Amino acid sequence: MMIGSTEFTFDKGCGEYVGKLQVWGRETDVFLDTEHAEGESIDKIVTEKINWIEHNKEKIVKAFMEENDHYVDVVNEMIACGDFKADGPISADDFVNALFVDNVTIWVKGVDTDFALDLDAEPDYLLGHLAFMEIDNQYHVEFGGLNG
């Protein structure tokens, strides 16, 4: 299956199409669940959702930080104790600027298409975890917990 100029291949292990697209300036794994797609233009739907992620980084990060701004203090405590290597304390901006999209999953269902993404950080301010962000078909963003 082609999405734009990118080939997505079916992965029997996960039962989804898998490909790589640019999200927030990085090549990102994208998983497509097309089980409930009924003749829709999958290419159009996927492109719309990826473009929405591209243009709504601030909204996604804000939804994450509303429930997780304490991570800045946690990392700073770890830096002070020598448990996290850094040149000095980090700010909230440092934390936010370290976030990137690790992967995206899109459940293609026409107008009911919803999607999710995992945020990661470099440096690893999430301490080996990924932040699961859920986005419904009305583009409401919600933090769904930490993975890993």
Mark where each language-model region is:
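Acidic, proline/glycine-rich low-complexity IDRs
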Residues: M1-F10, C14-V18, N97-L99, N103-G148
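Amphipathic protein-protein interaction modules
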Residues: H55-Y125
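Long, contiguous N-terminal structural blocks used for assembly/anchoring
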Residues: M1-A86
